[in-house]
Every structure is written in structure tokens, then in C-alpha cells.
Amino acid sequence: MNRTILHSDCNCFYASVELLHHPELRGKPVAVGGDPEARHGIVLTADYTAKRYGVKTGMALWQAKQVCPDITFLPPRMDLYLRFSRMAQEIYADYTDKREPYGIDESWLDVTDSATLKGDGFHIAQEISSRMKKELGITVSVGVSFNKIFAKLGSDYKKPDAITTMYEDEFQRKAWCLPVSDLLYVGNATNKKLYSMGIRTIGDLAKSDETLLVRKLGKMGSILWAFANGYDESPVKLENTSAPVKSVGNSTTTPRDMETDEDVKIVLYILAESVAARLRENGFRCRTVEISVRDKELFHFSKQVKLQNASNITKEIAEAGYRLYKDNYRLPADDKELKSSRTEFFQKPLRSIGIRGTDFVTDYFWEQLDIFMDPQAREKQMKMDETVDIIRKRFGFYSVQRGLMYRDRILSACDAKSDHTVHPHGYFG
């Protein structure tokens, strides 16, 4: 049975939401990105007026000011954006329960079974687009296709406020002429390798020798070749699908790149809080902690460590993850030798990071504690975590925060446990 997959992308999401609250700025260049005097201030999102001046996501605020002197900067309000994201999901839920968020502002929808009641994919996309404007005041670009890859490509094809089809009988005509970098999972590093092989377009990739691609790119070569040729059977995950719990983890792509060890520590603690809380909810402790790291060039690795004692304590899980990071990665900003070196350094600022606990035992599992561990201090940490759980359940996630989180409100503005979405580039889970 042929599938009908939509990919809905909220246009300039942060900026669009802010303009609803600042109507006086409509038609003027606006960017969301914090304090322009801040050391790490970057553009998180620019509206289309600012983009016409050359302002781009990820650009330093001072650079944005140079190319667009009249730009207005607004500080990010992640709680507001998450609320709008949830309202968008409520609209999508009227059409299907097969919804897979891809970050805060994008989602795949499998509407195959909705055709009888709601009409074909293009008609559903029109309805969703209309409702988003009327009910939320924002626009979306929607791709309509027979798989997730080309649905995503369709939503990127034309912006803003557009619907693009990439059906099975037209994807070669529409997609193959596009730059290969437009294909999901082709980052800068992969694009450079493909360019060195003479591959410029998605069509070039589709017509390439799969064996040669595997030789140059490993298994990713075969995956990208399949994507370019329209071979993607990956399902849109059913909402609230549950399976036997074998691991508990969270990952995120941060609003700006992580450039220092402290940046990484903040994000790891946020994610570890979610992992530990979910372990406690399910009555588990983990004996192994694993981290996954991806830098701005999309190079990635995973490392794991066995804990001395099984744990669902936030601090123990976070510190185990942080030690793994410190033992296996150095950021340029924290490397004194690198600062004085003129050579290219292999490791770059980080784009995303994840942490998970595996190898479970139940809360009732007995084990002998390490003789060097202070049982009273550990008991204190357990009680503190349990108290935080109770407070947050009653008054909300932001009712109690670690002091560490106040060092960078952009990086820390995330409720990983409640949000719990798949973030780019988390396509393969």
C-alpha cells in the first residue's frame, strides 16, 4: 500500500511566535538571539525581512548587526515556543496519531489512513496550513510525499507558507536537480566528500555506484544512495508507542553550538535530570551510562562506562557522562595548546549531545556499595532528587532549577523530560 507522508515545518518559528507578541515589529528585520553584548550571542532564528539582508541562523549577533544595522534582537523564550509547539501537535492530532516530532518546529505525519475521512495528502496539507494561520497565527511549509525523506525535502523546497508534493512519479524531476546538501543527513563533511567524488546533485548521488559510495562513506553511503533513489520505508512513529524498556535516554540539538566545557556540562545535567527522573518513575537503576556526541561538521561518536554502583541519581549519571566527554573530546575554546596552534584541529564545537542509562536493575536489587563511597551523602542525593520530582510534578519543571542552569539561559531553556522529542539529527533514533 502506498503511503502518504507529510512533513510540516513552522516557518521562522521563534521569530514568528515573537511577532505575534510584538506586532509593531512586523515588516521590520527581527532576530531571536539573546543579548547582542553576550559573549556567545548568536542568531537562533531570523524573520524573512532580516534574511533578505543576509542575516542567517547561527550568525554572531554583531555580524548580523553589520549586515543589517536596523535589526531588532529579541531574547529567546523557550517556554513560549514549547507551548506553541504543543498547540501545533494538537492540530496535527486531528488528522493522525502517527506523528513524529523532528525538533520543536517540525513533524512528520503519516496520513495514509486518513484519506477516507479527510481527503488526500495535498488536501490535508491545505487544511493544516489554513488552521495554523487561523488558530496559531503562524505559517508552515508542508511537504507531501510517499516517504519521510522526500516529505522533508518537500517542506524545504519552497518557503514560506507553501505546499510541495514529491510524489513517486515526480520526485526525479523535482528532487534530482537539487544540491546534494539538501538531502537529509548530508552535512558539511559528507558534502565535501561527495563533492570530491564529482557528486553535486541528488540526481548525481542516485546514479552513482553504490559500492563506491560505501567504500568512501561506509554504510552511510548505501543509506544516502537509497534515500536519493526514493527507497525509504522508515515508519512515522505512532504517538505513545511503548516497548519493553531496555534503556532510558535523552538527546538534544542545542539552540547554539556548545563551545566550552561548561556549555556541555549544563546540557548534560539537563538531560541527566530527565534520564534519572524517568528511571525513578519506572523503578529502575542503570549500571551503564552512555553518551553520544555530534559536532558542527556532523562527526559523531558514542562512549559508555560501567558505574561502580547502579544508580538513578541525577548527579551520578551526569558526572559519569561528563567524565566520558572529558576523556574523549576537547573543545577548541578549552584547549590552551590549541589556542596557540595554527594547525587545523579535528574536533569542533558541538551541535548535539545525548546521554542514556542502560543495563537495568530494579530498585529492590541489592548490591554492596563501594567502600570509598559515602552512603550518607548518597542517601542525601537520593532524597534531594525525590523532593525535586515532587515539587516539579506539582508546580512545573521550572519551579526548581540547579544554579548551574542560570549561567546560560539559552542552553538551559529546555524541559527534556516533558519535551522528549527527536531532535535533528536524530533520524536513526
Segments the model singles out, each with a brief description of its role:
Residues 1-229, 236-239, 277, 375-429:
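Gly/Gly-Pro- and Ser/Thr-rich, intrinsically disordered tail segments characteristic of DNA damage-repair
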Residues 7, 182, 190-347:
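DNA-contacting surface of Y-family translesion DNA polymerases
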Residues 34, 113, 146, 295, ...:
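Non-catalytic surface loops within mature trypsin-like serine protease
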